[in-house]
């Protein structure tokens, strides 16, 4: 595994506060409606740095530090081969399950971490069929993480975006993936504000 865009607590890479799936989804992380103070952002940034470092130790994990809808640091985790799916399949491989068990431990350690899961497909077949497959992939990951003890309350968004975010620089097999986002819940934000 490895961290892409890793840095200090408040530093972040790509912005995910925008819409996922070219307008077909809501922003990652519900906006809390009030400005978050710098101290709160730094505190959450340190938590997310720790989560990113832990996730980077997972075999095959690609970890990227991103920003949520509140402008706070968040973490995106995808896998080289662990959560790649066969053609038209949402079945998790044994390697995928092993990686997800490790990720589940990170998620269980802090129940104030919210989770979004986004499923993706290649471009073979109809768009409608790919939407269904991408949703099934996201739900397969959610269900497996829950079977590993992650609280259902942590899952705030689970969706499939088919090939709306197809990466032309990758192979079709690499585009058959699921991305897991870890970001601050409203409770994590309140806890960070209270400690400042």
Task: Give residue spans per PLM region.
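Periplasmic OmpA-like peptidoglycan-binding domain that tethers envelope proteins to the cell wall
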Residues: 120-191
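Extracytoplasmic
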Residues: 58, 70-74, 78-80, 110-112, ...
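Solvent-exposed coil/turn segments that connect beta secondary-structure elements
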Residues: 60, 68, 80-82, 88-90, ...
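Short, low-complexity, glycine-enriched hydrophobic/amphipathic alpha-helices that associate
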Residues: 1-54
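Solvent-exposed, polar/charged alpha-helical surfaces in well-ordered, non-transmembrane soluble domains
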Residues: 53, 57, 94, 98-105, ...
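Amphipathic, membrane-active segments
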Residues: 47-76
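Periplasmic peptidoglycan-binding/anchoring modules of Gram-negative envelope and division proteins
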Residues: 84-119, 146, 180, 187-195
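Second-shell loop/turn segments in exported
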Residues: 40-42, 84-93, 127-130
């Amino acid at each position: 595994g490895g961290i892409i865009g890793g840095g200090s607590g408040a530093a972040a890479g790509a912005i995910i506060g925008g819409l996922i799936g070219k307008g077909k989804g809501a922003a990652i992380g519900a906006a809390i409606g009030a400005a978050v103070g710098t101290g709160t952002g730094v505190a959450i940034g340190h938590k997310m740095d720790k989560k990113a470092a832990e996730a980077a130790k997972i075999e095959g994990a690609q970890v990227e530090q991103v920003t949520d809808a509140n402008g706070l640091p968040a973490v995106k985790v995808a896998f080289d081969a662990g959560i790649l799916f066969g053609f038209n399949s949402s079945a998790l491989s044994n390697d995928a399950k092993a990686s997800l068990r490790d990720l589940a431990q990170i998620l269980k350690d802090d129940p104030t971490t919210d989770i979004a899961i986004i499923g993706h497909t290649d471009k073979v077949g109809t768009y409608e069929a790919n939407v269904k497959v991408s949703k099934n992939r996201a739900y397969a990951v959610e269900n497996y993480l829950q079977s590993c003890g992650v609280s259902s309350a942590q899952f705030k968004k689970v969706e499939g975006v088919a090939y709306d975010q197809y990466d032309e620089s990758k192979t079709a097999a690499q585009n058959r993936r699921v991305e897991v986002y870890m970001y601050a819940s409203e409770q994590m934000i309140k806890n960070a504000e209270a400690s400042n």
